[in-house]
Protein backbone atom coordinates (compact mmCIF):
# COMPACT_ATOMS: atom_id res chain seq x y z
CA UNK A 1 0.00 0.00 0.00
CA UNK A 2 1.13 3.56 -0.75
CA UNK A 3 2.64 5.45 2.18
CA UNK A 4 0.47 8.24 3.61
CA UNK A 5 1.65 11.70 2.58
CA UNK A 6 -0.54 13.38 5.24
CA UNK A 7 -1.25 11.40 8.41
CA UNK A 8 -1.95 14.25 10.85
CA UNK A 9 -5.60 13.15 11.24
CA UNK A 10 -4.51 9.67 12.43
CA UNK A 11 -1.74 11.16 14.57
CA UNK A 12 -4.13 13.53 16.36
CA UNK A 13 -6.60 10.69 17.06
CA UNK A 14 -3.74 8.76 18.68
CA UNK A 15 -2.59 11.91 20.54
CA UNK A 16 0.74 12.05 18.72
CA UNK A 17 2.31 15.45 17.87
CA UNK A 18 1.00 17.35 14.81
CA UNK A 19 2.01 20.60 13.09
CA UNK A 20 -1.54 22.00 12.82
CA UNK A 21 -4.95 20.77 14.03
CA UNK A 22 -6.33 18.37 11.40
CA UNK A 23 -9.79 19.06 9.99
CA UNK A 24 -12.54 17.36 8.01
CA UNK A 25 -16.31 17.86 7.83
CA UNK A 26 -19.12 15.43 8.42
CA UNK A 27 -21.05 15.19 5.11
CA UNK A 28 -18.16 16.91 3.31
CA UNK A 29 -19.24 15.10 0.13
CA UNK A 30 -22.76 16.44 -0.13
CA UNK A 31 -25.45 18.64 -1.58
CA UNK A 32 -23.77 21.97 -0.76
CA UNK A 33 -21.28 21.20 -3.58
CA UNK A 34 -22.46 21.85 -7.16
CA UNK A 35 -20.19 19.03 -8.40
CA UNK A 36 -21.96 16.60 -6.04
CA UNK A 37 -25.37 17.68 -7.35
CA UNK A 38 -24.13 17.05 -10.91
CA UNK A 39 -22.88 13.55 -10.00
CA UNK A 40 -26.15 12.74 -8.28
CA UNK A 41 -28.07 13.83 -11.38
CA UNK A 42 -25.81 11.59 -13.52
CA UNK A 43 -26.33 8.63 -11.19
CA UNK A 44 -30.10 9.08 -11.25
CA UNK A 45 -30.74 8.95 -7.52
CA UNK A 46 -29.03 8.77 -4.13
CA UNK A 47 -28.99 4.95 -3.84
CA UNK A 48 -27.41 4.58 -7.30
CA UNK A 49 -24.69 6.97 -6.12
CA UNK A 50 -24.06 4.81 -3.01
CA UNK A 51 -24.24 1.45 -4.76
CA UNK A 52 -21.91 2.22 -7.67
CA UNK A 53 -18.28 2.18 -6.41
CA UNK A 54 -17.12 4.50 -9.23
CA UNK A 55 -19.75 7.13 -8.37
CA UNK A 56 -19.08 6.71 -4.63
CA UNK A 57 -15.37 7.28 -5.31
CA UNK A 58 -16.07 10.31 -7.52
CA UNK A 59 -18.14 12.10 -4.86
CA UNK A 60 -15.77 11.11 -2.02
CA UNK A 61 -12.93 12.83 -3.90
CA UNK A 62 -14.84 16.02 -4.82
CA UNK A 63 -14.33 17.92 -1.53
CA UNK A 64 -10.64 16.91 -1.49
CA UNK A 65 -10.14 18.28 -4.98
CA UNK A 66 -11.87 21.53 -4.01
CA UNK A 67 -10.33 21.95 -0.54
CA UNK A 68 -6.63 21.02 -0.21
CA UNK A 69 -6.90 21.70 3.56
CA UNK A 70 -8.97 18.55 4.21
CA UNK A 71 -6.95 16.07 6.27
CA UNK A 72 -9.20 13.04 5.71
CA UNK A 73 -11.62 11.54 3.21
CA UNK A 74 -14.78 9.79 4.38
CA UNK A 75 -16.40 6.96 2.48
CA UNK A 76 -19.51 8.13 0.63
CA UNK A 77 -22.30 5.83 1.76
CA UNK A 78 -25.33 5.82 4.06
CA UNK A 79 -25.79 4.48 7.58
CA UNK A 80 -28.88 2.53 6.43
CA UNK A 81 -27.01 0.12 4.16
CA UNK A 82 -27.05 -2.49 6.98
CA UNK A 83 -30.86 -2.58 7.49
CA UNK A 84 -31.22 -2.62 3.70
CA UNK A 85 -28.94 -5.68 3.54
CA UNK A 86 -31.10 -7.28 6.26
CA UNK A 87 -34.00 -7.15 3.81
CA UNK A 88 -35.79 -4.00 5.00
CA UNK A 89 -36.02 -2.50 1.50
CA UNK A 90 -34.50 0.99 1.77
CA UNK A 91 -35.81 3.72 -0.53
CA UNK A 92 -35.81 7.52 -0.50
CA UNK A 93 -38.95 9.66 -0.80
CA UNK A 94 -38.30 13.14 -2.20
CA UNK A 95 -38.53 15.61 0.67
CA UNK A 96 -39.19 12.80 3.18
CA UNK A 97 -35.79 11.19 3.59
CA UNK A 98 -35.17 7.46 4.03
CA UNK A 99 -38.05 4.96 4.24
CA UNK A 100 -38.24 1.18 4.58
CA UNK A 101 -40.67 -1.08 2.74
CA UNK A 102 -40.69 -3.43 5.76
CA UNK A 103 -40.76 -2.37 9.41
CA UNK A 104 -39.69 -4.36 12.45
CA UNK A 105 -42.49 -4.52 15.02
CA UNK A 106 -42.50 -7.97 16.66
CA UNK A 107 -40.08 -10.43 18.21
CA UNK A 108 -40.75 -12.74 15.24
CA UNK A 109 -39.70 -9.94 12.82
CA UNK A 110 -36.44 -9.55 14.72
CA UNK A 111 -35.75 -13.28 14.94
CA UNK A 112 -36.14 -13.51 11.15
CA UNK A 113 -33.52 -10.81 10.45
CA UNK A 114 -30.29 -12.16 8.94
CA UNK A 115 -26.86 -10.82 9.89
CA UNK A 116 -25.46 -9.51 6.58
CA UNK A 117 -22.17 -10.77 5.21
CA UNK A 118 -20.15 -7.63 4.41
CA UNK A 119 -18.65 -9.16 1.26
CA UNK A 120 -21.71 -10.92 -0.16
CA UNK A 121 -24.46 -8.53 0.93
CA UNK A 122 -22.56 -5.22 1.14
CA UNK A 123 -19.83 -5.90 -1.40
CA UNK A 124 -20.55 -2.60 -3.16
CA UNK A 125 -19.41 -0.76 0.00
CA UNK A 126 -16.21 -2.82 0.26
CA UNK A 127 -15.56 -2.19 -3.45
CA UNK A 128 -16.09 1.55 -2.90
CA UNK A 129 -13.57 1.55 -0.03
CA UNK A 130 -10.87 -0.18 -2.10
CA UNK A 131 -11.61 2.02 -5.15
CA UNK A 132 -11.33 5.20 -3.05
CA UNK A 133 -8.08 4.02 -1.42
CA UNK A 134 -6.56 3.47 -4.86
CA UNK A 135 -7.72 6.91 -6.03
CA UNK A 136 -6.43 8.64 -2.89
CA UNK A 137 -2.98 7.17 -3.49
CA UNK A 138 -1.81 8.13 0.01
CA UNK A 139 -3.03 11.76 -0.08
CA UNK A 140 -4.97 11.54 3.19
CA UNK A 141 -6.45 8.70 5.28
CA UNK A 142 -9.87 7.23 4.48
CA UNK A 143 -12.53 7.04 7.19
CA UNK A 144 -15.05 4.20 7.16
CA UNK A 145 -18.26 4.42 9.17
CA UNK A 146 -21.48 2.88 10.36
CA UNK A 147 -24.56 3.92 12.29
CA UNK A 148 -24.80 2.72 15.90
CA UNK A 149 -27.15 -0.17 16.72
CA UNK A 150 -29.58 2.13 18.55
CA UNK A 151 -29.69 4.65 15.70
CA UNK A 152 -30.19 1.91 13.09
CA UNK A 153 -32.92 0.32 15.26
CA UNK A 154 -34.90 3.59 15.36
CA UNK A 155 -35.13 3.67 11.55
CA UNK A 156 -36.01 -0.03 11.34
CA UNK A 157 -38.81 0.13 13.92
CA UNK A 158 -40.21 3.51 12.82
CA UNK A 159 -39.92 2.66 9.11
CA UNK A 160 -37.93 5.86 8.52
CA UNK A 161 -36.93 9.01 10.40
CA UNK A 162 -38.99 10.16 13.37
CA UNK A 163 -39.41 13.19 15.62
CA UNK A 164 -40.41 11.33 18.79
CA UNK A 165 -39.41 7.65 18.25
CA UNK A 166 -42.70 6.53 19.77
CA UNK A 167 -42.66 3.00 18.28
CA UNK A 168 -39.01 2.40 19.14
CA UNK A 169 -39.34 3.66 22.70
CA UNK A 170 -42.57 1.72 23.22
CA UNK A 171 -40.69 -1.44 22.20
CA UNK A 172 -37.77 -0.53 24.45
CA UNK A 173 -39.99 -0.17 27.54
CA UNK A 174 -42.72 -2.75 26.71
CA UNK A 175 -40.50 -5.46 25.29
CA UNK A 176 -36.86 -4.88 26.26
CA UNK A 177 -36.05 -8.51 25.38
CA UNK A 178 -37.03 -7.90 21.74
CA UNK A 179 -35.13 -4.60 21.64
CA UNK A 180 -32.01 -6.26 23.07
CA UNK A 181 -32.20 -9.01 20.45
CA UNK A 182 -32.47 -6.41 17.67
CA UNK A 183 -29.57 -4.39 19.07
CA UNK A 184 -27.44 -7.51 19.50
CA UNK A 185 -27.99 -8.52 15.87
CA UNK A 186 -27.17 -4.97 14.77
CA UNK A 187 -24.00 -4.91 16.92
CA UNK A 188 -22.81 -8.14 15.26
CA UNK A 189 -23.66 -6.68 11.84
CA UNK A 190 -21.89 -3.37 12.50
CA UNK A 191 -18.77 -5.14 13.82
CA UNK A 192 -18.37 -7.32 10.73
CA UNK A 193 -19.29 -4.39 8.43
CA UNK A 194 -16.64 -2.09 9.93
CA UNK A 195 -14.04 -4.87 9.99
CA UNK A 196 -14.83 -5.47 6.31
CA UNK A 197 -14.24 -1.77 5.61
CA UNK A 198 -10.94 -1.87 7.54
CA UNK A 199 -9.73 -4.91 5.58
CA UNK A 200 -10.77 -3.17 2.33
CA UNK A 201 -8.67 -0.12 3.27
CA UNK A 202 -10.43 2.18 5.77
CA UNK A 203 -7.73 3.68 8.01
CA UNK A 204 -10.05 4.92 10.79
CA UNK A 205 -13.72 4.25 11.56
CA UNK A 206 -16.49 6.31 13.10
CA UNK A 207 -19.73 5.08 14.68
CA UNK A 208 -22.54 7.61 14.27
CA UNK A 209 -24.95 7.43 17.22
CA UNK A 210 -27.19 10.16 15.85
CA UNK A 211 -30.17 9.42 18.11
CA UNK A 212 -28.45 8.23 21.31
CA UNK A 213 -28.95 11.66 22.86
CA UNK A 214 -32.74 11.17 22.70
CA UNK A 215 -32.58 8.47 25.38
CA UNK A 216 -32.72 8.89 29.15
CA UNK A 217 -29.37 8.51 30.92
CA UNK A 218 -30.22 4.97 32.09
CA UNK A 219 -31.61 3.89 28.70
CA UNK A 220 -28.56 5.34 26.91
CA UNK A 221 -26.22 3.16 28.97
CA UNK A 222 -28.28 -0.01 28.46
CA UNK A 223 -29.56 0.35 24.90
CA UNK A 224 -26.93 2.43 23.10
CA UNK A 225 -23.55 2.61 24.82
CA UNK A 226 -23.45 -1.07 25.85
CA UNK A 227 -23.73 -2.11 22.19
CA UNK A 228 -21.16 0.42 20.97
CA UNK A 229 -18.77 -0.93 23.62
CA UNK A 230 -19.40 -4.44 22.28
CA UNK A 231 -18.60 -3.28 18.72
CA UNK A 232 -15.42 -1.45 19.76
CA UNK A 233 -14.14 -4.57 21.55
CA UNK A 234 -14.61 -6.60 18.34
CA UNK A 235 -12.95 -4.24 15.86
CA UNK A 236 -9.64 -4.80 14.09
CA UNK A 237 -7.43 -2.14 15.70
CA UNK A 238 -4.29 -2.58 13.60
CA UNK A 239 -3.97 -3.06 9.85
CA UNK A 240 -1.27 -2.38 7.23
CA UNK A 241 1.25 -1.92 10.04
CA UNK A 242 -0.52 0.93 11.81
CA UNK A 243 -3.27 1.48 14.35
CA UNK A 244 -6.84 1.94 13.11
CA UNK A 245 -8.41 4.58 15.40
CA UNK A 246 -12.08 4.37 16.37
CA UNK A 247 -14.28 7.45 16.91
CA UNK A 248 -17.61 7.30 18.78
CA UNK A 249 -20.03 10.16 18.14
CA UNK A 250 -23.24 10.40 20.16
CA UNK A 251 -25.13 13.55 19.19
CA UNK A 252 -26.44 14.99 22.46
CA UNK A 253 -24.03 12.88 24.52
CA UNK A 254 -22.25 15.74 26.30
CA UNK A 255 -23.63 14.78 29.71
CA UNK A 256 -22.19 11.25 29.45
CA UNK A 257 -18.64 11.89 28.22
CA UNK A 258 -16.97 9.94 31.03
CA UNK A 259 -18.90 6.74 30.34
CA UNK A 260 -18.46 7.12 26.56
CA UNK A 261 -14.71 7.63 27.09
CA UNK A 262 -14.67 4.31 28.99
CA UNK A 263 -16.09 2.41 25.98
CA UNK A 264 -12.63 1.76 24.53
CA UNK A 265 -12.58 4.07 21.49
CA UNK A 266 -9.63 6.34 20.67
CA UNK A 267 -11.70 9.49 20.20
CA UNK A 268 -15.09 11.00 20.99
CA UNK A 269 -17.04 13.21 18.60
CA UNK A 270 -18.67 16.23 20.23
CA UNK A 271 -21.71 18.17 19.08
CA UNK A 272 -21.74 21.96 19.38
CA UNK A 273 -23.71 22.08 22.67
CA UNK A 274 -20.62 20.92 24.56
CA UNK A 275 -17.65 23.17 25.42
CA UNK A 276 -14.55 21.45 24.04
CA UNK A 277 -12.26 22.86 26.74
CA UNK A 278 -14.53 21.46 29.45
CA UNK A 279 -14.71 18.14 27.57
CA UNK A 280 -10.90 18.03 27.46
CA UNK A 281 -10.70 18.63 31.22
CA UNK A 282 -13.20 15.82 31.80
CA UNK A 283 -11.94 13.10 29.42
CA UNK A 284 -8.94 14.46 27.50
CA UNK A 285 -6.56 12.26 29.49
CA UNK A 286 -8.27 9.18 28.05
CA UNK A 287 -9.38 10.05 24.52
CA UNK A 288 -8.87 12.47 21.65
CA UNK A 289 -11.75 14.82 20.83
CA UNK A 290 -13.35 15.63 17.48
CA UNK A 291 -15.50 18.67 16.82
CA UNK A 292 -17.30 20.79 17.42
CA UNK A 293 -18.38 23.97 15.60
CA UNK A 294 -22.10 24.55 15.15
CA UNK A 295 -22.64 23.79 11.42
CA UNK A 296 -24.93 26.82 11.07
CA UNK A 297 -21.96 29.13 11.78
CA UNK A 298 -21.13 28.45 8.09
CA UNK A 299 -24.09 30.68 7.14
CA UNK A 300 -22.27 33.64 8.73
CA UNK A 301 -19.64 35.79 6.99
CA UNK A 302 -16.09 34.34 6.66
CA UNK A 303 -14.74 36.74 9.33
CA UNK A 304 -17.32 35.46 11.84
CA UNK A 305 -16.50 31.85 10.92
CA UNK A 306 -12.81 32.57 11.52
CA UNK A 307 -13.57 34.11 14.92
CA UNK A 308 -15.57 31.05 16.00
CA UNK A 309 -12.79 28.69 14.82
CA UNK A 310 -10.32 30.72 16.89
CA UNK A 311 -12.57 30.54 19.95
CA UNK A 312 -12.87 26.73 19.75
CA UNK A 313 -9.11 26.28 19.21
CA UNK A 314 -8.39 28.50 22.23
CA UNK A 315 -10.93 26.59 24.33
CA UNK A 316 -9.20 23.28 23.52
CA UNK A 317 -5.78 24.85 24.10
CA UNK A 318 -2.26 23.70 23.31
CA UNK A 319 -1.20 20.27 22.16
CA UNK A 320 -2.51 17.38 20.13
CA UNK A 321 -5.60 15.21 20.58
CA UNK A 322 -8.03 17.48 18.72
CA UNK A 323 -9.49 16.85 15.26
CA UNK A 324 -11.48 19.90 14.17
CA UNK A 325 -14.90 19.18 12.70
CA UNK A 326 -18.43 20.47 12.76
CA UNK A 327 -20.73 19.36 15.57
CA UNK A 328 -22.93 17.63 12.99
CA UNK A 329 -23.11 17.37 9.19
CA UNK A 330 -22.70 20.36 6.88
CA UNK A 331 -26.10 21.45 5.55
CA UNK A 332 -27.08 21.64 1.85
CA UNK A 333 -27.59 25.43 1.72
CA UNK A 334 -24.05 26.35 2.86
CA UNK A 335 -21.99 28.45 0.43
CA UNK A 336 -18.94 26.32 -0.57
CA UNK A 337 -16.76 29.44 -0.20
CA UNK A 338 -17.70 29.60 3.48
CA UNK A 339 -16.69 25.95 3.96
CA UNK A 340 -13.33 26.84 2.40
CA UNK A 341 -12.93 29.80 4.76
CA UNK A 342 -13.62 27.48 7.71
CA UNK A 343 -11.02 24.91 6.62
CA UNK A 344 -8.35 27.54 5.94
CA UNK A 345 -8.98 29.17 9.32
CA UNK A 346 -8.42 25.89 11.18
CA UNK A 347 -4.94 25.37 9.70
CA UNK A 348 -3.93 29.04 9.83
CA UNK A 349 -5.05 29.65 13.42
CA UNK A 350 -4.02 26.31 14.95
CA UNK A 351 -0.27 26.28 14.22
CA UNK A 352 0.39 28.40 17.35
CA UNK A 353 -1.11 25.64 19.54
CA UNK A 354 1.38 23.04 18.25
CA UNK A 355 4.72 24.87 18.66
Swiss-Prot record:
> Main EC class of this protein?
lyase
Q: Which reaction does it catalyse?
A: uroporphyrinogen III + 4 H(+) = coproporphyrinogen III + 4 CO2
An annotated Gene Ontology molecular function: uroporphyrinogen decarboxylase activity
Q: What is its EC number?
A: 4.1.1.37
What compartments host this protein? Cytoplasm
Q: Where is this site: Transition state stabilizer?
A: 78
Q: In which pathway does it act?
A: Porphyrin-containing compound metabolism; protoporphyrin-IX biosynthesis; coproporphyrinogen-III from 5-aminolevulinate: step 4/4
Q: Which UniProt keywords apply?
A: Cytoplasm, Decarboxylase, Lyase, Porphyrin biosynthesis
Any Gene Ontology CC annotation: cytosol
Report the main location listed first in the record.
Answer: cytoplasm
Which residues does the annotation say bind substrate?
27-31, 78, 155, 210, 328
GO BP terms in the entry: protoporphyrinogen IX biosynthetic process from glutamate
In which family does this protein belong, per the annotation? Belongs to the uroporphyrinogen decarboxylase family.
Tell me, what does this protein do in biology? Catalyzes the decarboxylation of four acetate groups of uroporphyrinogen-III to yield coproporphyrinogen-III.
Subunit structure and binding partners: Homodimer.
* Protein name listed in UniProt: Uroporphyrinogen decarboxylase
Q: Which organism is it from?
A: Pseudomonas fluorescens (strain SBW25)
Amino acid sequence: MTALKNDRFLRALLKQPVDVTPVWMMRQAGRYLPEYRASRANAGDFMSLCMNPEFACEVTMQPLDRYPQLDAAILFSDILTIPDAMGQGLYFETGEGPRFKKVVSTLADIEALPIPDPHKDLGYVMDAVSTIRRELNGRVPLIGFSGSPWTLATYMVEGGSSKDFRKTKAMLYDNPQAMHLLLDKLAQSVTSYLNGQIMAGAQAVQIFDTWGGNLSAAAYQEFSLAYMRKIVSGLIREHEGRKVPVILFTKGGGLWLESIADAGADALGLDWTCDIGEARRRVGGQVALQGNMDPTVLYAKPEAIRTEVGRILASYGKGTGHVFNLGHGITPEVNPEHAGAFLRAVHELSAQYHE
